[in-house]
Structure formats: structure tokens, C-alpha cells
Curated annotation (Swiss-Prot):
GO terms for biological process: protein refolding. GO terms for cellular component: cytoplasm. This is 33 kDa chaperonin. Keywords: Chaperone, Cytoplasm, Disulfide bond, Redox-active center, Stress response, Zinc. CDD domains: Hsp33. The gene is hslO. Disulfide bonds join 230-232, 263-266.
Amino acid sequence: MPQHDQLHRYLFENFAVRGELVTVSETLQQILENHDYPQPVKNVLAELLVATSLLTATLKFDGDITVQLQGDGPMSLAVINGNNNQQMRGVARVQGEIPENADLKTLVGNGYVVITITPSEGERYQGVVGLEGDTLAACLEDYFMRSEQLPTRLFIRTGDVDGKPAAGGMLLQVMPAQNAQQDDFDHLATLTETIKTEELLTLPANEVLWRLYHEEEVTVYDPQDVEFKCTCSRERCADALKTLPDEEVDSILAEDGEIDMHCDYCGNHYLFNAMDIAEIRNNASPADPQVH
């Protein structure tokens, strides 16, 4: 049966290696439900969601991570944003025809992966790696080796459970300031690579970990729920309107009678009429009509 969207952290007692396991279904469905994406794009967003959840769980502070693919292919952008509370949102932009069996490079074309880490306090960090690997997991493994010099492996699977999209993934990483033997890490990676999609998406995390590592000593920590959550708001839209030239705003009002701001992530609409705009310009809070 399908599992609740959760992330599990675990630690190998005899190796300086830590791991994570995440499965998502409801969160993925909510990201996809307001859009009519082709199946290959849905698959990429599913992989991005899993990857972002796994990467966000590596944060040692409050903040968020955005993982995005950009390129000159028919899928010009795919992005997932998540925070340390495992609250996720995402969107893709598609232009042109996409073959049913399109792989990552066909979708993105000449492109790159951008990882943006934004602490709640402190400076933002951004890393960029070229889309050189055949998979998103390979590109992110390259990112970890370049940016943090930490051997890292990601294992991402996508599929369907009870006819609904689902995805899961696992991460193995040598712990910082530890001297894990490469042979040990490779051994654990080889075990992890044997995980079947059906097992990862349908079995409880503890059973997955036992099947993979029953000959190892593994400590599993309390799970963390993963959920869809959009951070859009009427106030943020009002702040965005403040940055536009008055002439542009007035022109839209004259033509349409109101300004309709649409959130690509969740599908919400925020409507502003002439009175709302006047209040915004006077630094007052506009009324709060919202259309779903």
C-alpha cells in the first residue's frame, strides 16, 4: 500500500556514512494537479522533488533550498523549492513539442542545474553545475563533489502507486570530517543501488532499510513529514506590484478593470482593483479577496 510522505534519516554505526530515504505521493500530486504536463516533465518534477527533499535534509540550519533545471530545450525550466520543514512546491515551463520518451537532455537541451541555498539568517549560496550527467542524480552527485568535496550518491525512482504518481529516493553521504574508507562507501552504495522501484514506493522505510542493510548496524531516526506548501500571499503580490511603474499598472487597470496575479506554484489568483492599488500606493493593506 502507498506510504505517507515522509523522510527518514539513518546512520551506519560501523561506517562514517549517513543516509536518507524519502517517499512522496500526495505532495507530488499537489504539485502536478494544476498543470497539464507531458509525462516526461512529470517524471522530471518527481525526481526534482525527491532530490530537493533529500538535499534540504542535509541542511544544518533553518532555511530553504531551490533546485532548478534551466536550458534551451522544450522544458526551459523545472524547479522545486523546499525548506528545512520539508514543505515543498514546484513548477515547470514547457514550450514546444515533447516526445513521449524524452530523456533529461532532450527536455532541457543545453542547460545546467542551479542549487540555491538560502539560510533564514546569513548569506545566500548558489552553485551551478552543467547538465553533463545522464540523470539528475548524477548531476547532483557532481555538485556535491565540487562544492563540498563529500562523496555522495543519490538513488531516485519514479512510478505509480494505485494509479497515482509517486516517487522515492535515497541518499548516501560520507560524513564531514570523517575518514570513511572508499571501499566501505562503495559497498553501501552497491547495496543501495539494488532497491527496486516497487519496494521503495510501497514498503515501509524500516523494511526497505532492513532488506538493503540487514547485515549492517543501522540507526534510524524519527521521520519527518513531507508536504506541499506554497508561500504565495496577497501581501507578496502587493509588494511585487509596488516595484512596477505606475504607468504600467494604470494601463492594465484601464484595459482590464483589475489586475489578476496568478501563482504558478499553486494556481491561486489574487485580484487587485483600482481602490486596492490606491491603498497599496498609500502603504495601506488592501482587502483580502482571493480567488482559488
